Amino acid sequence: MGSRLHVQVIHGGPPLPYKDDIRAFGKEYAEQLDAQDPLRRFRDEFIIPSKKDLKRKTLFPNDGMYSCGHPICFANTSCACVHAAETEETSDEKCIYLCGNSLGLQPRSTRKYIDHYLRTWATKGVTGHFVPHDDQLLPPFVDVDEAGAKLMAPIVGALKSEVAVMGTLTANLHLLMASFYRPTPERNKIIIEGKAFPSDHYAVESQIRHHNLDPKDAMVLIEPEDLDRPILDTKYILRVIDENAHSTALILLPAIQFYTGQYFDIQRITAHAQSKGILVGWDCAHAAGNVDLRLHDWNVDFAAWCTYKYLNAGPGGMAALFVHERHGRVDIEQAASGKEAFHPRFSGWWGGDKQTRFLMNNHFVPQQGAAGFQLSNPSVLDMNAVVASLELFNQTSMAEIRKKSLNLTGYLEHLLLRDPQTENSEKRPFSIITPSNPAERGAQLSIRLQPGLLDRVLESLNEDAVIIDERKPDVIRVAPAPLYNTYAEVWRFAQLFHLACDKALCGRK
């Protein structure tokens, strides 16, 4: 495992509460864990889809009418019908939603934030950019990016100046690589994993081609040594780095691998690569809001992530990036004299110094830090959705979220592998390809089914209103989110999953 100061070392701490306790396989035990959960109040801050919601063919019940007969209208959120409908909805049986690694659930406050934005735009027009209001949830439009950065920074272990909430994930990776990938005849390779998320692969490949290089020569793929165990051991990654050290300019790896759920040793890999003169970037899409990151302390050069997974900002929500403070410094005196004063980057007006931004003098001096990498003014609509969720995260800490996540996912693993009826691995129709060491994974468990079972298992789970994620041909990804998932849900999922496997096996015979 190496020297991993950034994770809770399970084996060195007290035993998890469900170990060696036969009661752990009962519903009452799971409910007891929920009663003792210090984060349990956060579940009420999210809208959990009901079984009726999932099966309904329309977005609104009663053909767009409330049960009172009034038409649904979200423009008037003070209408008694709206609140009555919300009260009625909570009485429906909720689905089991274990898919926060794909799309997080909607915070209840999201609508309030967006309503405030719409009202500001409607009643203030362009003055909404600059005029503060006593009842505002966010500052005027011109300053919303600062509000997002302030809330995001502690979630990824960064200084506020090192974070910018902006753009989309792949676009941000391109911007960062345009700045940090500076190939020379001697050093022009980029090292990535062989099974990287396709968009990352495409981005790296196109960056190499952009510099008139051939990916066959300049792209190093770290492939799993054992296809039956698609995990990249840290020592193996370091060996690949050593083998290519003198010809490599950049490394881009995922903090957490999207398919296996493996949590890479960011601190160790970063330090090792940098000791060889290589810049290191991380795709934190599956890590932000999931594990307790320390991007500043680990000396990461740059990172990027989306906000629609564990950060619950909605489909395609605004992304974010990190640039370590040593790369974000701007020498104002040098810039004033026209000399090179900051790290090279693609530039846009919103990244310019706020004091001179509106002078329109075509002399670009970036803001200090990651803010200087911004291009255009951010979508205030999207920023409100981001901030609505980040406010919840800032009511606790990533250390507390990670602590519950370790227990919650560990409990799920325990129920799947240690159930007396399925403990015999030879008879079990599935295996878990995610690392068994809790320090080497996030919330997600990737479960590989025997060939031919996936569709039948998914059909059964769908009938029971269980929402998880699939990866063809035979893997499901299950990710309990600590802010809104419960131990009782995990227990119920394990029961339904075992039943689904039994049905699938019977159907195959």
UniProtKB/Swiss-Prot annotation:
Reactions performed catalytically: L-kynurenine + H2O = anthranilate + L-alanine + H(+); 3-hydroxy-L-kynurenine + H2O = 3-hydroxyanthranilate + L-alanine + H(+)
Localization: Cytoplasm
Co-factor requirement: pyridoxal 5'-phosphate
Gene Ontology biological process terms from the UniProt entry: 'de novo' NAD biosynthetic process from L-tryptophan; anthranilate metabolic process; L-kynurenine catabolic process; L-tryptophan catabolic process to kynurenine; quinolinate biosynthetic process
Pfam families associated with the record: KYNU_C
Binding residues annotated for pyridoxal 5'-phosphate, in chain numbering: L169, T170, F197, P198, S199, D200, D283, H286, Y308, W349, N377
Gene3D superfamilies from the UniProt entry: Aspartate Aminotransferase, domain 1 (3.90.1150.10), Type I PLP-dependent aspartate aminotransferase-like (Major domain) (3.40.640.10)
The protein's annotated pathway: Amino-acid degradation; L-kynurenine degradation; L-alanine and anthranilate from L-kynurenine: step 1/1; Cofactor biosynthesis; NAD(+) biosynthesis; quinolinate from L-kynurenine: step 2/3
In-chain residues carrying the UniProt-annotated modification N6-(pyridoxal phosphate)lysine: K309
GO molecular function annotation: kynureninase activity; pyridoxal phosphate binding
Main location: cytoplasm
Enzyme Commission number(s) from the entry: 3.7.1.3
UniProt entry keywords in alphabetical sequence: Cytoplasm, Hydrolase, Pyridine nucleotide biosynthesis, Pyridoxal phosphate
Domain of life: Eukaryota
One Gene Ontology cellular component annotation held by this UniProt entry: cytoplasm
PANTHER family: KYNURENINASE
Family membership: Belongs to the kynureninase family.
NCBIfam families (alphabetical): kynureninase
Reported function: Catalyzes the cleavage of L-kynurenine (L-Kyn) and L-3-hydroxykynurenine (L-3OHKyn) into anthranilic acid (AA) and 3-hydroxyanthranilic acid (3-OHAA), respectively.
Assembly behavior: Homodimer.
Name of this chain's protein: Kynureninase 1
Source organism of the structure: Aspergillus fumigatus (strain ATCC MYA-4609 / CBS 101355 / FGSC A1100 / Af293) (Neosartorya fumigata)
Lineage of source species: Eukaryota, Fungi, Dikarya, Ascomycota, Pezizomycotina
